[in-house]
Amino acid sequence: MSSAKLGSASEDVSRRDANYHPTVWGDFFLTHSSNFLENNDSILEKHEELKQEVRNLLVVETSDLPSKIQLTDEIIRLGVGYHFETEIKAQLEKLHDHQLHLNFDLLTTYVWFRLLRGHGFSISSDVFKRFKNTKGEFETEDAWTLWCLYEATHLRVDGEDILEEAIQFSRKKLEALLPELSFPLNECVRDALHIPYHRNVQRLAARQYIPQYDAEPTKIESLSLFAKIDFNMLQALHQSVLREASRWWKEFDFPSKLPYARDRIAEGYYWMMGAHFEPKFSLSRKFLNRIIGITPLIDDTYDVYGTLEEVTLFTEAVERWDIEAVKDIPKYMQVIHTGMLGIFEDFKDNLINARGKDYCIDYAIEVFKEIVRSYQREAEYFHTGYVPSYDEYMENSIISGGYKMFIILMLIGRGEFELKETLDWASTIPEMVKASSLIARYIDDLQTYKAEEERGETVSAVRCYMREFGVSEEQACKKMREMIEIEWKRLNKTTLEADEISSSVVIPSLNFTRVLEVMYDKGDGYSDSQGVTKDRIAALLRHAIEI
């Protein structure tokens, strides 16, 4: 508990304190700048030359389909597929022939299946049946093939028993073989067993795979070099955007004005970069980074520091969405309110109106109001002692987890759709958005409920499930992990069924879910970013790849 007083906060109120650590970065990203592109026109020329070479490799006609499948997959895994979206789509459409696999070996079939399903093509898992023996069992001891099989199984949907068998078979085999494997296959397998490619942050997966591919004797030199140069060029761009975000953060001086809250602007950028890293979305990342920076300040105010009376005043001010409302909230909250309105005004002026889609700002504001309402309900749970049912808790937490909001804001920021119906559809929390939000909630609660209980919280998915169904803590946690797998299968299914209206939601839903999987894989990597999160941010945003 804390009795610290901020602004006009009441002196006689005992306040909680989550004891979040200060930023691990200090002013590093405020001043850091890559010199990779400085006075180096030759790098830009080489990049363009290599890009054309890789494009030629991709589009050249060949009867060697296994090699073309492998090349397409490597281009994507190396993180350079965004340069060749049209060419890759054309190749995948050619490969989407249900009879092709009859001529493929095990390894090629597994890669082909994952590649096509991963891009929304419907492929039956029955293609795996011909690789079973007369006893109906998978049988292969080849580590590379097992790795590809294991990766493919994570595209499964509900009811695909053959893929359930395959994941158990391949995982058991790979765990036994791992100590005997050498680089680079050992790292490929270790990475997959920890977080499979389909669930990994694509930029982080590329950073891991670039040195692995570079060590393969069969690598294509031009592709390997192109991936390294492209990574470093993109890193320089991201550093520039993060530097601007850090400057904005420092100007508002959030850390000193709100010392109880998480100071995580770099971690927020890592989150948004994981969701969409491509250069053409720089403006969108700028806006979303500010949103993901300020949203936890609000969350921590409701969850940790504010009284029920104070947060209720803030909720009312957000509902009014008027600068004049700042006079009706405690002084310490005013910097959040001012920053919040400024973010959305900037978003409207520089991104939304510039595209002639001014109606989007109403969706953006409404979804932000919605998450504040959900924080209000959670504050009421704590301050009144109310314990919601499991379903009631989950219904509210789908919103408070933030993924519906971030998916809709990312849709607006990307601006890749023309139909207003897409925003209307996403706003109803369809299965795709719901699955992403539920995965986020289960993962979050599993990693944070004990820490929250230490500061007085009693409401979480784990505790609500225990209370309602009369099970132990261990059983409830096991159920949450099972639900994560169920919702992943549902998310996979909905992405395969996407139509004109919902197709724009696929990438935001998948990528935000991937970020959560990675950010919380070893604990709450956002709140406590001193360990693996710091290392991952450094790998993506600090350290260039040696060429």
UniProtKB/Swiss-Prot annotation:
It comes from the Eukaryota. Keywords: Magnesium, Metal-binding. GO terms for biological process: diterpenoid biosynthetic process. Mg(2+) 1 binds at D299, D303. The keyword Metal-binding applies. Mg(2+) 3 binds at D444. Its cofactor is Mg(2+). Changing Y110S: Restore guaiene synthase activity. Restore guaiene synthase activity. No effect. No effect. No effect. Mg(2+) 2 binds at D299, D303. Changing P296S: Restore guaiene synthase activity. Restore guaiene synthase activity. No effect. No effect. No effect. A motif (DDXXD motif) lies at residues 299-303. Changing H337Y: Restore guaiene synthase activity. Restore guaiene synthase activity. No effect. No effect. No effect. InterPro entries: Isoprenoid_synthase_dom_sf, Terpene_cyclase-like_1_C, Terpene_cyclase_plant_C1, Terpene_synth_N, Terpene_synth_N_sf, Terpene_synthase-like, Terpene_synthase_metal-bd, Terpenoid_cyclase/PrenylTrfase. Induction: Up-regulated by methyl jasmonate. CDD domains: Terpene_cyclase_plant_C1. One of its GO terms (molecular function) is terpene synthase activity. Binds 3 Mg(2+) ions per subunit. Site-directed mutagenesis and 3-D homology modeling suggest that the structure of the N-terminal domain is important in facilitating proper folding of the protein to form a catalytically active enzyme. The Asp-Asp-Xaa-Xaa-Asp/Glu (DDXXD/E) motif is important for the catalytic activity, presumably through binding to Mg(2+). Belongs to the terpene synthase family. This is Inactive delta-guaiene synthase.
